[in-house]
Amino acid sequence: MTTEDKVQELTANCLRDQLGWQSVYAYNQEDYGENSLLGRQNQKEVILKRYLKQKLREFNPNLPEEAYNSAILQIEEINSSQTLLATNQEKHQLLLDGVQVSYRNAKGELIRQTLKILDFDQPSNNHFLAVRELWIQGEIYLCRTDLVGFVNGIPLLFLEAKNLNRDLKAAYDENLLKYIRTIPHLFAYNAFAILVNGIDTKIGSFCGKYEHFHPWKRLAESDPGIVDMETMLKGVCDKNNFIDLLENYVLFDNSTGKTCKIIARNHQFLGVNQAINSVKRWREGGIKDNKLGVFWHTQGSGKSYSMVFFTRKIRRKLGANYTFVICTDRADLDEQIYYTFAGSGLTNNEQELCRASSNEHLQSLLGEHKAYIFTLIQKFNQTVNPDQPYNSRNDIIIISDEAHRTQYGTLASNLRAALPGAGFIGFTGTPLVSNDEITKRYFGDYVSTYDFQRAVEDKATVPLYYDARGDKLSIAVNDLNEQIAAKIEELEIENVEIEDRLERELRRDYYILTAPQRLEALARDFVEHYSTAWETGKAMVICIDKLTCVKLHNLIDRYWSEKIQQLKKDLKKITDDQEENYRQRQIQWMEATLTAVIVSEEQGEIDKFQKHGLDITIHRSVIKNGFELADGKRISPENAFKQADHPFRIAIVCAMWLTGFDVPSLSTLYLDKPLKAHTLMQAIARANRVNEGKTNGLIVDYCGILKNL
């Protein structure tokens, strides 16, 4: 049972016998014409019009024939000037919304009507057909696909099988990529691509990198998890799951300026559906205290997209009147989550205001029945009269994103008084720590969990390794970490500029951490360490405050230049050709590398930095204007750092980019800021994203804080 044919056969049999699909073997049995096996006129057709027209008639009865024919023509039509991904996005939206046709009724009146293509409410009403070994003619080449899954005649599933001895990447490289080039019109409609070899199996988007294909190991969140073909097929191709995934768990995100097709991972599908079941219980009166639960999916596992899936499915399936208030406690996190929602097409602040700029503006937005409102919890800074709430509707859901530090106290009390009928759900990438009863008190128990270990096992994230370099260099401040971390958290919650307060209130502790000789040692070690790890990816350095960021930047800049000069001197002594080539590439990489300080703006910052002999303006210019590209255009620091091939490789930060900022090519995080447990876990997880060729992330701990995690 190891041949490719047997794997195909087992797959088709599972779809037919266990999941209720029809199954057809087309290789040498298909004929052509209206009454043929599949009703295709020729091998170039990828829409099975026989089944499509049957369902159009069934779902939209008693229309003239011209209406059905017009719908089929629109579904078949492909704009050759578009990219394949743009066409796929267009066809996906057409499936969700239906196809609009015009026809004249018996009275000669022009009627416009939207025809339903798929039944999303009763999945079993759709026609599911698996076709093995289907011949498809491209512009030049004739290709034979292993298995194509049609729903109502539309090719939504592509499955490529290999024998037991072949790696799944061969199915991706040798077949999927080839078919995208040679028979692209098949993928204009594709929802899911599955790769199988009888044991291993992965699902992804046809336009995604292989690294973004993922297993489907569980049918329920409580399952231990097993990688096998049957679990994948039952999890994805069960009729209810397939239609649910198609309708609610596929999105197109252009938040980075480049459109990406996102398919929910196994844990997102299961977790979001559990969260939605919690909302259903709340609506039915089964939850009396408005606590919808805590959604804990470890950092790097797609929590922001899970929020998008959650809100979008609720508005589509439970009612379009719901309002979601996405509440964070940091301006940069608020911006990042807004751009994820906007990039996914759910909202647009430029067209319709949805981002609260003040308490008064927040009150105004809440009175306008918006779909989405984005706010900092600090905007709830006014005491609320319980008899005069901002809005008493019971179809408002508050999503608290990583707000462990601010979900209690005055601001949270104001929030709950302002929206007494709202439901509350907490999304977090870090577990509730042992003494975190406050979180449970406000949100309830876990509604879904996906921990660090599972994420690594599922390859949703890479493992993180730890290097206690602070101890090796004797610059760790082990006994001071907790005290400093507590003070930093206190000041950041108050949303104040922390340098002066830290210096004044911590005094000796602050001076120890920011002592010139300590920063010198740290900068030297960073340059030595990162310059020898130059092939691994990008680096982020986390400092205690803005002043220290700029001080460290200046030191790194100096030692980086010295290191380049030393390597050039050493190059002259090298006699081995391979080593010489390696060193030349290292020098070129170092010379091209850009370093930037990324910190938030504050009033009077020029004078403040000048008092310390520092210049913030050169860094502020980069933050505001970004970097110039070869074509003269400019790219923002955020997008430059996210692009693996852009030479902005070293980001020095103190608070920005520590949460909700995904950079798959970030491989090493250099930590020199004492942080409390939740924030610390969020920060170190910056390095756990999956990327091509990346096997792990590395946390270099200079201050010694990770010992106590």
Please provide the spans of the model-predicted regions.
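Short, conserved "post-DEAD/DEAH" coupling segment immediately C-terminal to helicase motif II
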Residues: L177-R181, T406-G423, A687
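A short beta-strand element within the Helicase C-terminal
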Residues: I652-V653, W657-P674, L680-Q682, G697-D701
